């Protein structure tokens, strides 16, 4: 990259890197995906030897990877055409031929992958519906469940893939499914991965449940589940051995997710989202105490606990590109290439929508005084959230002299169940009211020029 390119283009071209995962039995062996080559490809690295390499080289790009438990093979989901339909492939960690990982599984859309000693589980959807396959002791995979409604391996939807599917000893498999409701309000089902028999189920009518992470202790049948019985997402521990359900006592505003356990199963790694900014905590299960983990404000894209108790996380900020860090603040993996030019900071912002609601969002401005021409940049979903997170497109508009307003309108996540579900049966009304109210507020603040306003997203 050359300094002669404008800052906005350099931001788009700066390589990005995911948070590395590691092999459970060989934690020095890492897997991650990066855009060093121009599109996302899977990479591996060995912390013990310093060796590393790019594993995939596919024109469509490869965004999902994992390591086998022993670290001898790297697994990746390859989509040949960009349709997102593909297969899991395996390649030796040190290099060699890539071959389909699970025999007996046809091409489809990725529904998650989980591994435990002696068992592998994979979710696949195709034109015929949604299915779950398991391979026992390396044998060809068998279909153990199929349905017409969404079924995914636990952890996929929670962002904790590899931790929320199979219990540590492989005796239980958690699935998130919509057989009783819909995509927005899934239930959690636990089955025997060898027979497909139902062990237990949790269903909250009109509310969402998602499996997050199993205890790492073999034989421990405690599963962290995310629920929204109090309005905001909250973690609970479901003990499949006893049936006991324990809600975590957390005096925090906004969604809270438990994303991993410490290796001795004494504490949970918790991510708290407070109005579009995340904070990591350690939650001690015995005393029920919460301790903040120090880091800069921003958005935590992923976080996990290393076998030695260190915490790794991926942090993004509106004005700084994402970095993969340890609790000490050191980078755990860094892509080759120049760092992205710093952008302008996101400003947290509230306004009244004229219908009795207080709406939250962020805005960004160029240097100097307004009013500026403005882009009201609307997130998709609608079940999504604008957070204090790096976005080269937003910074490009700011470089061109525009202010950018981002509104977490009714229908967005991050502000409770009722706020998210407000658009059900009423698409095209409340969200437009909120975005327009946000524009009016920015005009009133002197940030935006009402005669030079556009909408995008």
Predicted regions and their residues:
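Peripheral, non-catalytic segments that deliver or gate enzyme domains
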Residues: 2-370, 382-400, 425-427, 432, ...
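Conserved alpha/beta-hydrolase
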Residues: 401-416
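Structural cue for short, hydrophobic secondary-structure segments
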Residues: 377-380, 396, 406
